[in-house]
């Protein structure tokens, strides 16, 4: 895939909308448009890497440090019972967007994990409201 058609590259370059909750010089964290639960966050490198096989070690470590921080914040803000962190590599693993990303998903007791494609899109208003709550915690 050429980077010009990558939706996550477009989000990183502000050419597509996203409800951003965290940003630094290397990564961006924003709410998934098809959330498994409210607060479902994606963390991406700003630079295009297709999957974990391509990303430099220092960058993947940074992405996961932000993933840990995001998991703590999402759990606190949503009141979730737990957090699932998912990172898929390749079509066979379920990767749908071929730009490295990790999912930080709030989970509740007794809940099963559906396929991401079976989840309806959330409204931009819902995403922005949750993004504001999470952004506030990142500033603390």
Task: Walk through the language-model features, giving the residues of each.
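HIT superfamily nucleotide-processing domains
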Residues: 1-140
């Amino acid at each position: 895939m050429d980077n010009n058609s990558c939706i996550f590259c477009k989000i990183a370059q502000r050419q597509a909308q996203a409800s951003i909750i965290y940003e630094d010089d290397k990564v961006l964290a924003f709410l998934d448009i098809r959330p498994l639960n409210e607060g479902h966050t994606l963390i991406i490198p700003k630079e295009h890497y297709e999957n974990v096989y391509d990303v430099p070690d220092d960058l993947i470590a940074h992405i996961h440090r932000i993933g840990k921080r995001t998991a703590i914040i999402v759990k606190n803000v949503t009141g979730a019972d737990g957090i699932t962190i998912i990172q898929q590599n390749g079509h066979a693993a379920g990767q749908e967007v071929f730009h490295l990303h990790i999912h930080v998903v709030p989970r509740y007791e007794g809940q099963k994990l559906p396929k991401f494609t079976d989840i309806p899109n959330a409204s931009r208003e819902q995403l922005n409201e949750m993004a504001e709550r999470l952004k506030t915690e990142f500033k603390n």
